[in-house]
Regions:
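Structured, solvent-exposed acidic/aromatic patches
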Residues: 1-287, 291-307, 311-315
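CBM-like carbohydrate-recognition segments
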Residues: 314-327
Length: 327
């Protein structure tokens, strides 16, 4: 992302194509935060200048990101940049996320600001001013919010979602050195994911379903066990991490991660026409809930958390999966 963004930003700046520069810098900021949150210190100020660039401290990188986000927001709010005659036409073929709509990119940038500021809680600058700044950024983002999604049309090769069934069985996924298959056709859910995250029950419950988390049916479908054994029934099986399956079992005895209900694919992520989410409304609401909690308003924090959960349930179409039994 960084190399491509640098080329876009440099060439756009030279041509005064401010709309393209804004999009490129926003993506660079997103990528920088994701990378430093994972790895800590990293090259930034000297990135791409040599084979052994200086490693900037994570603290200095956050200082740069906080400055960059304010400059970006200022440019998004300034018609001198957003309506410049030198801006280039940007459509869906260039911008797969918002088709060049800078208003939508602006609200995404406010969301990134909220994500940046959240890092100050609870141990860095946990005070009323920080909490209010986060809440304000979230509110500005929500004023014109649209989920930030990279959508796939389906078809051949890279036209399919990287988590789609097209890449489920092969290591390379048909993309050669450019990509890898997701191997979900041979993946088995872990004990931690099933028990600690989803709260799976020992067996299906006619009233409660398969797990505490009703999204389980949007993630996977149960499959029968080995025929001729005492465990031939249809169950949500799983394995402990790094523990192999018994010799009588095959991958087909464990849940499929390309779930179906009444013969219809239901996962929003593992379909070939799925999407990669860059920022969702649920995250915005949870960020606001966190800030509201630390500001002392726990009832509102709880309400926001519940609202985020409901939106996520709607995202996974639970009402259509469960039908009349879903409440």
């Amino acid at each position: 992302i960084g190399v491509n963004a640098k080329e876009i930003i440099d060439e756009a700046h030279e041509a005064q194509a401010w709309n393209l520069e804004l999009i490129g810098r926003t993506l660079r900021l997103m990528s920088t935060q994701m990378t430093t949150d994972l790895f800590g210190d990293m090259p930034r100020s000297e990135a791409y200048e040599s084979n052994s660039p200086h490693y900037d401290t994570q603290e200095s990188i956050y200082e740069w990101m906080n400055q960059e986000i304010e400059e970006l927001i200022g440019m998004y709010e300034d018609p001198t940049y957003t309506e410049a005659a030198t801006n280039i036409p940007i459509d869906q073929s260039i911008d797969r996320v918002f088709a060049g709509d800078l208003n939508k990119w602006k609200h995404y940038t406010y969301a990134l600001k909220a994500r940046l500021l959240l890092r100050k809680l609870p141990n860095w600058e946990n005070n009323a001013a920080t909490c209010q700044a986060i809440i304000t950024a979230v509110n500005r983002a929500l004023e014109g919010w649209e989920d930030v999604l990279y959508r796939f049309d389906g078809g051949n090769g890279a036209q399919n979602s990287p988590w789609g069934e097209a890449f489920g069985s092969t290591e390379q996924g048909g993309l050669g050195w450019e990509g890898r298959g997701n191997m979900l056709n041979s993946a088995v859910p872990t004990k931690y994911f099933m028990e600690n995250i989803l709260g799976v029950f020992e067996s299906h419950n006619n009233l409660k379903g398969w797990a505490e988390d009703p999204r389980i049916l949007a993630f996977m479908s149960a499959r029968p066990g080995p025929s001729g054994t005492s465990d031939s029934g249809t169950e949500m099986r799983y394995l402990d991490t790094n523990i192999g399956m018994d010799v009588s079992y095959k991958v087909d005895n464990y849940p499929t991660l390309f779930p179906e209900v009444d013969g219809k694919k239901v996962s929003v992520y593992t379909q070939n026409t799925g999407y990669v989410p860059l920022f969702l409304e649920e995250e915005l609401l949870l960020i606001k809930a966190e800030a509201t909690y630390w500001s002392g308003d726990k009832p509102t924090a709880r309400s926001l958390t519940m609202q985020a959960a409901e939106i996520n349930f709607d995202r996974f179409n639970l009402s259509s999966i469960y039908g009349s039994s879903y409440t």
